[in-house]
UniProtKB/Swiss-Prot annotation:
It comes from Homo sapiens (Human). This is Gap junction beta-5 protein. The lineage of its organism: Eukaryota, Metazoa, Chordata, Craniata, Vertebrata. Residues 1-20, 99-126, 211-273 are cytoplasmic. The gene is GJB5. Belongs to the connexin family. Beta-type (group I) subfamily. One gap junction consists of a cluster of closely packed pairs of transmembrane channels, the connexons, through which materials of low MW diffuse from one cell to a neighboring cell. Residues 41-75, 150-187 are extracellular. Its main location: membrane.
Protein backbone atom coordinates (compact mmCIF):
# COMPACT_ATOMS: atom_id res chain seq x y z
CA UNK A 1 0.00 0.00 0.00
CA UNK A 2 1.27 3.46 -0.93
CA UNK A 3 1.06 5.35 2.36
CA UNK A 4 1.96 8.70 0.75
CA UNK A 5 -1.21 8.57 -1.36
CA UNK A 6 -3.20 7.52 1.70
CA UNK A 7 -1.75 10.41 3.71
CA UNK A 8 -2.58 12.86 0.91
CA UNK A 9 -6.20 11.71 0.83
CA UNK A 10 -6.52 12.07 4.61
CA UNK A 11 -5.05 15.58 4.56
CA UNK A 12 -7.47 16.54 1.79
CA UNK A 13 -10.47 15.22 3.72
CA UNK A 14 -9.29 17.01 6.86
CA UNK A 15 -8.77 20.28 4.95
CA UNK A 16 -12.32 20.50 3.63
CA UNK A 17 -14.10 19.28 6.77
CA UNK A 18 -15.64 21.22 9.64
CA UNK A 19 -14.45 20.82 13.23
CA UNK A 20 -17.00 18.04 13.74
CA UNK A 21 -15.77 16.36 10.57
CA UNK A 22 -12.17 16.43 11.78
CA UNK A 23 -13.18 14.80 15.06
CA UNK A 24 -15.10 12.16 13.11
CA UNK A 25 -12.09 11.53 10.87
CA UNK A 26 -9.77 11.08 13.85
CA UNK A 27 -12.22 8.74 15.55
CA UNK A 28 -12.65 6.60 12.43
CA UNK A 29 -8.99 6.19 11.53
CA UNK A 30 -7.56 5.91 15.04
CA UNK A 31 -10.23 4.07 17.02
CA UNK A 32 -11.82 2.07 14.22
CA UNK A 33 -9.47 1.45 11.30
CA UNK A 34 -6.23 1.07 13.27
CA UNK A 35 -7.85 -0.99 16.02
CA UNK A 36 -9.45 -3.16 13.36
CA UNK A 37 -6.15 -3.72 11.54
CA UNK A 38 -4.19 -4.43 14.71
CA UNK A 39 -6.69 -6.48 16.72
CA UNK A 40 -9.59 -7.88 14.70
CA UNK A 41 -7.70 -10.35 12.55
CA UNK A 42 -5.88 -11.77 15.57
CA UNK A 43 -8.98 -12.13 17.73
CA UNK A 44 -11.09 -13.76 15.00
CA UNK A 45 -8.34 -15.67 13.21
CA UNK A 46 -9.10 -19.00 14.92
CA UNK A 47 -12.87 -18.68 15.41
CA UNK A 48 -13.72 -21.53 13.03
CA UNK A 49 -10.85 -23.81 14.00
CA UNK A 50 -11.56 -23.49 17.74
CA UNK A 51 -15.34 -23.80 17.41
CA UNK A 52 -15.76 -27.19 19.11
CA UNK A 53 -18.92 -29.26 19.40
CA UNK A 54 -19.36 -32.32 21.65
CA UNK A 55 -19.96 -34.69 18.77
CA UNK A 56 -17.88 -36.56 16.24
CA UNK A 57 -20.52 -36.48 13.53
CA UNK A 58 -18.78 -35.35 10.30
CA UNK A 59 -19.92 -31.92 9.15
CA UNK A 60 -21.84 -31.08 12.33
CA UNK A 61 -19.33 -28.49 13.55
CA UNK A 62 -19.24 -26.76 10.16
CA UNK A 63 -23.03 -26.58 9.91
CA UNK A 64 -23.40 -25.26 13.46
CA UNK A 65 -20.69 -22.66 12.92
CA UNK A 66 -22.43 -21.44 9.77
CA UNK A 67 -25.74 -21.27 11.62
CA UNK A 68 -24.44 -19.12 14.47
CA UNK A 69 -21.91 -17.11 12.42
CA UNK A 70 -23.58 -16.50 9.03
CA UNK A 71 -21.22 -13.57 8.37
CA UNK A 72 -17.92 -13.03 10.11
CA UNK A 73 -17.51 -9.95 12.29
CA UNK A 74 -14.27 -9.15 10.50
CA UNK A 75 -15.90 -9.18 7.04
CA UNK A 76 -18.78 -7.02 8.18
CA UNK A 77 -16.48 -4.47 9.80
CA UNK A 78 -14.28 -4.33 6.71
CA UNK A 79 -17.27 -3.64 4.46
CA UNK A 80 -18.63 -1.09 6.94
CA UNK A 81 -15.37 0.86 7.13
CA UNK A 82 -15.03 0.92 3.34
CA UNK A 83 -18.55 2.26 2.84
CA UNK A 84 -18.16 4.81 5.64
CA UNK A 85 -14.89 6.32 4.39
CA UNK A 86 -15.68 6.49 0.66
CA UNK A 87 -18.11 9.48 0.83
CA UNK A 88 -15.41 11.67 2.39
CA UNK A 89 -13.12 10.89 -0.53
CA UNK A 90 -15.91 11.93 -2.93
CA UNK A 91 -15.86 15.40 -1.34
CA UNK A 92 -12.13 15.65 -2.07
CA UNK A 93 -12.75 14.52 -5.65
CA UNK A 94 -15.46 17.18 -6.06
CA UNK A 95 -13.05 19.89 -4.90
CA UNK A 96 -10.38 18.56 -7.27
CA UNK A 97 -12.92 18.69 -10.11
CA UNK A 98 -13.66 22.33 -9.29
CA UNK A 99 -9.98 23.20 -9.29
CA UNK A 100 -9.50 21.54 -12.69
CA UNK A 101 -12.48 23.42 -14.11
CA UNK A 102 -11.11 26.69 -12.75
CA UNK A 103 -7.70 25.99 -14.28
CA UNK A 104 -9.19 25.19 -17.69
CA UNK A 105 -11.29 28.34 -17.54
CA UNK A 106 -8.24 30.50 -16.89
CA UNK A 107 -6.30 28.80 -19.68
CA UNK A 108 -9.15 29.35 -22.14
CA UNK A 109 -10.04 32.94 -21.23
CA UNK A 110 -6.85 34.30 -19.70
CA UNK A 111 -5.77 35.16 -16.19
CA UNK A 112 -7.69 38.45 -16.20
CA UNK A 113 -11.04 36.80 -16.92
CA UNK A 114 -13.67 36.19 -14.27
CA UNK A 115 -13.34 33.18 -12.02
CA UNK A 116 -15.74 30.25 -11.99
CA UNK A 117 -15.26 29.69 -8.25
CA UNK A 118 -14.03 32.33 -5.84
CA UNK A 119 -13.00 29.50 -3.50
CA UNK A 120 -13.21 25.96 -4.94
CA UNK A 121 -12.95 24.39 -1.49
CA UNK A 122 -15.71 26.43 0.13
CA UNK A 123 -18.87 24.42 0.77
CA UNK A 124 -21.24 26.29 -1.52
CA UNK A 125 -23.55 25.21 -4.31
CA UNK A 126 -23.02 21.64 -5.47
CA UNK A 127 -20.15 21.03 -3.04
CA UNK A 128 -22.44 21.84 -0.10
CA UNK A 129 -24.93 19.23 -1.29
CA UNK A 130 -22.15 16.69 -1.84
CA UNK A 131 -20.91 17.21 1.71
CA UNK A 132 -24.41 17.00 3.22
CA UNK A 133 -25.23 13.84 1.24
CA UNK A 134 -21.96 12.29 2.41
CA UNK A 135 -22.95 12.91 6.04
CA UNK A 136 -26.37 11.34 5.53
CA UNK A 137 -24.83 8.34 3.76
CA UNK A 138 -22.18 7.77 6.44
CA UNK A 139 -24.72 7.91 9.26
CA UNK A 140 -27.09 5.61 7.34
CA UNK A 141 -24.34 3.04 6.73
CA UNK A 142 -23.36 2.91 10.40
CA UNK A 143 -27.01 2.63 11.49
CA UNK A 144 -27.66 -0.14 8.96
CA UNK A 145 -24.63 -2.15 10.06
CA UNK A 146 -25.50 -1.77 13.74
CA UNK A 147 -28.93 -3.16 12.91
CA UNK A 148 -27.39 -6.06 10.95
CA UNK A 149 -25.04 -6.89 13.81
CA UNK A 150 -27.92 -6.82 16.27
CA UNK A 151 -29.97 -9.10 14.01
CA UNK A 152 -27.19 -11.68 13.73
CA UNK A 153 -25.93 -11.38 17.30
CA UNK A 154 -28.63 -10.18 19.75
CA UNK A 155 -27.37 -7.45 22.09
CA UNK A 156 -23.99 -7.78 20.31
CA UNK A 157 -23.02 -10.48 22.82
CA UNK A 158 -21.57 -13.91 22.01
CA UNK A 159 -22.47 -16.63 24.53
CA UNK A 160 -19.70 -19.03 25.53
CA UNK A 161 -21.87 -22.05 24.69
CA UNK A 162 -24.55 -22.44 22.01
CA UNK A 163 -26.91 -25.34 21.39
CA UNK A 164 -27.22 -26.66 17.86
CA UNK A 165 -29.68 -29.16 16.40
CA UNK A 166 -29.12 -28.65 12.67
CA UNK A 167 -28.64 -31.54 10.27
CA UNK A 168 -26.48 -33.65 10.13
CA UNK A 169 -26.06 -33.40 13.91
CA UNK A 170 -27.62 -36.54 15.50
CA UNK A 171 -29.25 -34.57 18.34
CA UNK A 172 -28.94 -31.28 20.22
CA UNK A 173 -25.22 -30.68 20.70
CA UNK A 174 -23.29 -28.09 22.68
CA UNK A 175 -20.79 -25.95 20.78
CA UNK A 176 -18.15 -23.80 22.43
CA UNK A 177 -17.01 -20.42 21.09
CA UNK A 178 -13.35 -19.49 21.31
CA UNK A 179 -12.42 -16.46 23.47
CA UNK A 180 -15.98 -15.13 23.91
CA UNK A 181 -15.07 -12.47 26.51
CA UNK A 182 -12.34 -10.93 24.36
CA UNK A 183 -14.60 -10.93 21.32
CA UNK A 184 -17.45 -9.34 23.27
CA UNK A 185 -15.22 -6.53 24.56
CA UNK A 186 -13.91 -5.82 21.08
CA UNK A 187 -17.42 -5.96 19.57
CA UNK A 188 -18.84 -3.53 22.12
CA UNK A 189 -15.92 -1.18 21.51
CA UNK A 190 -16.60 -1.14 17.77
CA UNK A 191 -20.33 -0.65 18.36
CA UNK A 192 -19.68 2.26 20.75
CA UNK A 193 -17.32 4.02 18.32
CA UNK A 194 -19.83 3.57 15.49
CA UNK A 195 -22.56 5.11 17.66
CA UNK A 196 -20.33 8.10 18.46
CA UNK A 197 -19.61 8.54 14.74
CA UNK A 198 -23.35 8.56 14.01
CA UNK A 199 -23.84 11.25 16.66
CA UNK A 200 -21.03 13.38 15.19
CA UNK A 201 -22.50 13.08 11.69
CA UNK A 202 -25.93 14.18 12.91
CA UNK A 203 -24.47 17.12 14.87
CA UNK A 204 -22.45 18.24 11.84
CA UNK A 205 -25.51 17.93 9.61
CA UNK A 206 -27.57 20.09 11.96
CA UNK A 207 -24.72 22.62 12.12
CA UNK A 208 -24.44 22.92 8.32
CA UNK A 209 -28.20 23.19 7.75
CA UNK A 210 -28.66 25.77 10.52
CA UNK A 211 -25.72 27.79 9.19
CA UNK A 212 -27.20 27.80 5.69
CA UNK A 213 -30.62 28.84 7.04
CA UNK A 214 -28.98 31.68 8.97
CA UNK A 215 -27.22 32.88 5.81
CA UNK A 216 -30.48 32.77 3.83
CA UNK A 217 -32.26 34.80 6.50
CA UNK A 218 -29.40 37.31 6.59
CA UNK A 219 -29.57 37.73 2.81
CA UNK A 220 -33.34 38.27 2.87
CA UNK A 221 -32.99 40.73 5.73
CA UNK A 222 -30.38 42.69 3.77
CA UNK A 223 -32.63 42.80 0.71
CA UNK A 224 -35.59 43.90 2.85
CA UNK A 225 -33.53 46.71 4.37
CA UNK A 226 -32.49 47.87 0.91
CA UNK A 227 -36.09 47.84 -0.28
CA UNK A 228 -37.18 49.79 2.80
CA UNK A 229 -34.53 52.47 2.27
CA UNK A 230 -35.41 52.79 -1.44
CA UNK A 231 -39.18 52.29 -1.82
CA UNK A 232 -39.14 53.49 -5.45
CA UNK A 233 -36.93 50.60 -6.55
CA UNK A 234 -33.62 52.51 -6.71
CA UNK A 235 -31.63 49.93 -4.77
CA UNK A 236 -28.36 50.04 -6.68
CA UNK A 237 -26.58 52.28 -4.17
CA UNK A 238 -27.72 50.09 -1.30
CA UNK A 239 -26.41 46.98 -3.03
CA UNK A 240 -23.17 48.79 -3.75
CA UNK A 241 -22.71 49.55 -0.05
CA UNK A 242 -23.53 45.94 0.89
CA UNK A 243 -21.02 44.66 -1.62
CA UNK A 244 -18.34 46.94 -0.24
CA UNK A 245 -18.99 45.88 3.34
CA UNK A 246 -19.27 42.20 2.43
CA UNK A 247 -22.75 41.85 3.97
CA UNK A 248 -24.76 40.93 0.87
CA UNK A 249 -24.81 37.20 0.24
CA UNK A 250 -25.54 35.68 -3.14
CA UNK A 251 -27.16 32.24 -3.06
CA UNK A 252 -27.61 29.63 -5.73
CA UNK A 253 -25.21 28.90 -8.55
CA UNK A 254 -21.44 29.25 -8.78
CA UNK A 255 -21.66 32.37 -10.96
CA UNK A 256 -20.27 35.76 -10.04
CA UNK A 257 -22.42 38.40 -8.36
CA UNK A 258 -23.69 41.09 -10.73
CA UNK A 259 -21.12 43.79 -11.40
CA UNK A 260 -22.26 47.36 -11.08
CA UNK A 261 -20.98 49.97 -13.53
CA UNK A 262 -19.61 52.43 -11.01
CA UNK A 263 -17.62 49.93 -8.95
CA UNK A 264 -14.69 47.73 -10.02
CA UNK A 265 -14.68 43.95 -9.63
CA UNK A 266 -12.11 44.04 -6.84
CA UNK A 267 -14.62 45.52 -4.39
CA UNK A 268 -16.76 42.37 -4.39
CA UNK A 269 -15.68 40.70 -1.17
CA UNK A 270 -18.05 37.85 -0.34
CA UNK A 271 -20.01 35.55 -2.58
CA UNK A 272 -21.84 32.35 -1.74
CA UNK A 273 -21.66 29.92 -4.65
Amino acid sequence: MNWSIFEGLLSGVNKYSTAFGRIWLSLVFIFRVLVYLVTAERVWSDDHKDFDCNTRQPGCSNVCFDEFFPVSHVRLWALQLILVTCPSLLVVMHVAYREVQEKRHREAHGENSGRLYLNPGKKRGGLWWTYVCSLVFKASVDIAFLYVFHSFYPKYILPPVVKCHADPCPNIVDCFISKPSEKNIFTLFMVATAAICILLNLVELIYLVSKRCHECLAARKAQAMCTGHHPHGTTSSCKQDDLLSGDLIFLGSDSHPPLLPDRPRDHVKKTIL
